[in-house]
Amino acid sequence: DVDYWLNILPKNKELNNLSTSNNNIQIKKHNFTPIFIIGVPRCGSTLIEKIIASGPQYVSIGEETGILSTLVKQKIIEQKAIYFNIKDMRTELIQRYKEKNLIQQNSNYIFTDKTLDNFFYISLIKAIFPLSKIINCTREPLSSIMSILKNNLPNLPWAHDLDHIFRYFDI
């Protein structure tokens, strides 16, 4: 829904005012080090993810999981705000990443999540996964906008109207 992406989510102040006083997250004595790739669609994020995956260390590839955005949207809809326990949220997120087979021992608990709209959740990501890395993938905006229009992205409700696209880029 366009209203959610352009109005409700960007105005949610709780997402930007989270405590980051959590200790390192450990499960079975292993630290989780996700790599979040953020940006706008058609910004080159797939190339970045492939470069990361081609390195010598095994890294589980998350593509666009939408795990965090789905969970946050669920919390916003259920509670009209997202006051929640970070530890509970962490447990729920780790379980969802495990269900997608992203958290694997042979990857040394490093995985990528290329859900580009995770830029809305940077404070939340750092509170839940303090060891995480965040890569902001950028491209000349006009090139991204033209590519978004040309590719007719069906899963992005805001990507089919030029005014909506400009508003999304202004967030």
PLM feature segments, named:
Residues D1-N106:
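Alpha-helical solenoid repeat scaffolds of the TPR/TPR-like class and their adjacent stem/linker regions
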Residues I61, I67-F84, Q105-F111, T115-I171:
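PAPS-dependent sulfotransferase catalytic domain
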